Amino acid sequence: GWLAGISYKIPEYYFRTSLTYRSAIKHEMTTTESIEVGVVTPNVMEVKTPQSVNFDFMTGLPYQNILYGTLRWVNWQDFVIQPPKFKAVIDYVAIFYPEATDVKLIQYNKDQWSAKLGLAQVKKKKWLSTMELLWDSGINNPASTLNPSDGYQGIGLGSMYTYNTQFDIAAGLYYLH
């Protein structure tokens, strides 16, 4: 895969923006699957992670405030994980139950969009406090172990104290719904 981006900044306004593209990445891996019915399949599996686009911005506001945000798109629409022996079992079951043909171990049918908008305030050059609003479209799959959420809205609060140039202490809290 590859990554490309463009960035622009105006230091005197503390303005910075960037647009980044990450290509899909094809992975080929060896798999070890156990099955008792004697189905013989290749031990190599291919997974293609999706392409994505990120847009980020940050700008200074009066009274040592900073407005920042991100917008992200991920092309999950055609993402599938289907190990070879799992596919062989599904193909066999589909002989008797044709509706099983489309069953995949993991399959996402919708692209994902997410956004964040935040406001940060610098206090006495040592403290930074933030508040963020978050949104994620999800990918239209039910939540599971492999897909821990299907979209959310949320709010986040954070704070950071800069002790010196080599040591910071930070804490944050998000509420997602």
Listing of model-derived features with the role each one plays in the protein:
Residues 1-177:
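Outer-membrane beta-barrel porins/channels
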